[in-house]
């Protein structure tokens, strides 16, 4: 009779990740709701979708680095003093992003970035800069929510984080529906998705803020004890945050770069506007089945034995081996979802028509780009799993080169593929996939480097001799080291 291993160690992982996965999917659904708010506008819908898509993707470049304060809260915030230091860094970065938004909206810098580089006409360029101005305060509001989400995750309150994100999306959908019946549709249609975006973020910030103050604020010390290394310094937070911020910035700038090259490749014609609109519509739909895999980055730090919330329950059955197997199952599920949604005939078209509200002819243009998205889960899972391990070790500095390689591979693909007959949205998504593969490869190399440094360090050898005093010889030590690192 076959005996199945106990599933009990996996329930904490499932309970932790499911709300985060729902969070990620909810964000994509929110994007689709915002796109629908524009697509429903009958006059110049494609032009409006392209303008909002350009502004939104540029804005995401700023929200990306700031949203990684979630990981600062997850790894570093053990006391009220740690939180104050993290908030100081966050507000400084948010104000900087606000000023840059104003400069891009009102100066020749914005005209050059949007009109000249993207080769869009005056109408699209003007609407894009206006939308970018309206979005100036969003990065700071978004980051305030994320840092408290990270603190909640540290204490395993992922359900509150997931509920906040679902409420965010519900608020966006409700406000889109309300504003579509207002005079904004005629006066300023761009404000429909933008105001809905702000209201959703405000709801999310309110929920995670209340969750923090009701469940955590009074239960953490004013200062960190020596058992967790004392209070974190601003320097340590910065050195931990900047590689993650750089990586996320390059991930977020990838979309504007893709929009830029796709638009220039088609030389600013109506086909270029259509291609950017296709990319705007396919990004959230294609991202939905695999985007939640990124949340695997939070698993290792949350279940790390050095996490103060885990020291209370030292008998937790979750091991590194359980996390690896759980990660593989998540990958398999994501691949299955991608191939069912994007390769089953007419399913992806129906999603685009029914959810976003585009016409069927436009939806058919999105089929091939969506099928390319089916291969994204592989590099995303590898990157998330290894990044989580490096975050636990606080060795994020080795991840910085991966962002550089991602941009190099992305731009190379965008330049080379048109000579092979690939154009439009297919060019954009295919180049994104190449960039993901390049980035994940570099992350794997960085993880191998850190692993070998750990194994060869004198302290590591002493730890092995302490744990396994009967082991004699280098061969036995190497075997034991693999057991400790990888099991």
From Swiss-Prot:
Principal location listed in the UniProt entry: membrane
Record's bilayer topology term: Multi-pass membrane protein
GO biological process, one term: phosphate ion transmembrane transport
Keywords assigned: Membrane, Phosphate transport, Transmembrane, Transmembrane helix, Transport
GO cellular component: plasma membrane
PANTHER family per UniProt: PROGRESSIVE ANKYLOSIS PROTEIN HOMOLOG
Gene Ontology molecular function, alphabetical: inorganic diphosphate transmembrane transporter activity; phosphate transmembrane transporter activity
Role description: Regulates intra- and extracellular levels of inorganic pyrophosphate (PPi), probably functioning as PPi transporter.
Subcellular location: Membrane
Keyword Membrane applies: yes
Record family assignment: Belongs to the ANKH family.
Domain of life: Eukaryota
Chain segments annotated as transmembrane: 7-27, 86-106, 132-152, 159-179, 190-210, 326-346, 362-382, 407-427, 428-448
Name of this chain's protein: Progressive ankylosis protein homolog
């Amino acid at each position: 009779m076959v005996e199945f291993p106990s599933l009990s160690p996996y329930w904490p992982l499932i309970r932790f990740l499911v709300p985060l996965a729902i969070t990620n999917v909810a964000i994509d659904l929110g994007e689709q709701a915002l796109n629908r708010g524009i697509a429903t506008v009958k006059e110049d819908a494609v032009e409006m979708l392209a303008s909002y898509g350009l502004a939104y993707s540029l804005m995401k470049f700023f929200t990306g680095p700031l949203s990684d304060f979630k990981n600062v809260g997850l790894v570093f915030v053990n006391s009220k003093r740690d939180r104050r230091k993290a908030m100081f860094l966050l507000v400084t970065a948010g104000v900087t992003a606000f000023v840059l938004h104003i400069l891009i909206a009102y100066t020749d810098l914005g005209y050059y970035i949007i009109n000249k580089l993207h080769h869009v006409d005056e109408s699209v360029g003007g609407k894009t800069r206006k939308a970018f101005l309206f979005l100036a305060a969003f990065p700071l509001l978004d980051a305030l929510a994320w840092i408290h989400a990270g603190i909640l995750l540290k204490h395993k309150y992922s359900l509150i984080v997931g509920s906040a994100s679902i409420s965010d999306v519900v608020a966006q959908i409700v406000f889109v529906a309300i504003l579509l019946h207002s005079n904004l549709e005629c006066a300023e249609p761009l404000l429909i998705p933008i105001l809905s975006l702000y209201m959703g973020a405000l709801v999310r910030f309110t929920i995670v803020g209340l969750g923090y103050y009701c469940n955590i604020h009074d239960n953490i010390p004013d200062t960190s004890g020596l058992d967790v290394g004392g209070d974190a310094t601003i320097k340590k937070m910065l050195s931990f945050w900047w590689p993650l911020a750089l990586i996320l910035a390059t991930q977020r700038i990838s979309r504007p770069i893709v929009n830029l090259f796709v638009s220039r490749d088609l030389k600013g014609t109506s086909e270029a506007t259509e291609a950017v609109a296709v990319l705007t519509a396919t990004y959230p739909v294609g991202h939905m089945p695999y985007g939640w895999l990124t949340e695997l980055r939070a698993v290792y730090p949350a279940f790390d034995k050095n996490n103060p919330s885990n020291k209370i329950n030292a008998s937790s059955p979750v091991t590194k081996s359980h996390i690896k197997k759980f990660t593989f199952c998540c990958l398999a599920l994501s691949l299955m979802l991608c191939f069912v949604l994007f390769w089953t005939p007419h399913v992806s078209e129906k999603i685009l028509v029914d959810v976003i509200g585009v016409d069927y002819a436009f939806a058919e243009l999105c089929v091939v780009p969506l099928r390319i998205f089916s291969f994204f889960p592989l590099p995303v899972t590898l990157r998330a799993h290894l990044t989580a391990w490096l975050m636990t070790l606080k060795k994020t500095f080795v991840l910085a080169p991966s962002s550089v390689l991602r941009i190099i591979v992305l731009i190379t693909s965008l330049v080379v593929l048109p000579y092979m007959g690939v154009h439009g949205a297919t060019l954009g998504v295919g180049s994104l996939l190449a960039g993901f593969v390049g980035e994940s490869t570099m992350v794997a190399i960085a993880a191998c480097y850190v692993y070998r440094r750990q194994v060869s360090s004198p302290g590591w050898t002493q730890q092995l001799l302490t744990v396994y005093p009967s082991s004699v010889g280098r061969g036995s030590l190497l075997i034991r080291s693999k057991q400790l690192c990888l099991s």
